[in-house]
Amino acid sequence: MKRSSVFYWFTGVAIAAIAIGAAFYFDAAVRDFVAHHQNRALLHLMHNVSRLGDWPEHFVLGLVLTGIAWRCGNKKWTRVFLSMLIALALAGLVGRGIKIATARARPSVKMEEVLYWSRFSTKYHSFPSGHVAASVAFFGVLFLGSWRIGLACIPIPILIGLSRMYIGAHYLSDVVCAAILGILCALLVAHFLLRQIANRQSRIEN
């Protein structure tokens, strides 16, 4: 591994560790702030924004985009959109496993003893945010495939994360850790699937 790659990975891990630590530290403060600044109109809006992060919506969008790209004969974008779907599925599976393993109660749920069977209740699926992990993984691959288009879509997972905290579904740490999980899934999928596109394009240019 090149020194530059080691440096980037080390920097990324350091930033992630600091972000996770800070998120857990400010969990209670952010939860209390949100609870004191909720209003009915904004709560209704945030519920609708939160639905944008639902897994089926991302999956259908990915399928439609893949179908269009395949129909147009664009191999690059067919691979990109398929990679987005794979990253979406990976983030969903890993996130679900972590939710069941940690069984963290949502901010809106009163603290009580967590029995084994309650691990499978959505009330105890706070950590990490599945909506955020899926959205970040999905659009993260798009960013790695085309940073200009991906950059324009970055506000979507950000708004989803804010909405999940506002409606009391997640803590700040749930959202931050989910974003990191989504980034890792996007990088992993892109490394194996999108790298072939970059190598092919570089050979054509050379």
Regions found by a protein language model. Name each.
Residues 28, 32, 70-74, 100-108, ...:
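Transmembrane helix-loop junctions in multipass membrane proteins, especially transporters and channels
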Residues 32, 74-144, 149:
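Membrane-interface loops
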Residues 19, 83-87, 91, 95, ...:
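Alpha-helical transmembrane segments in multi-pass membrane proteins
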Residues 1-62, 99-121:
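N-terminal transmembrane-helix/juxtamembrane module of multi-pass inner/ER membrane proteins
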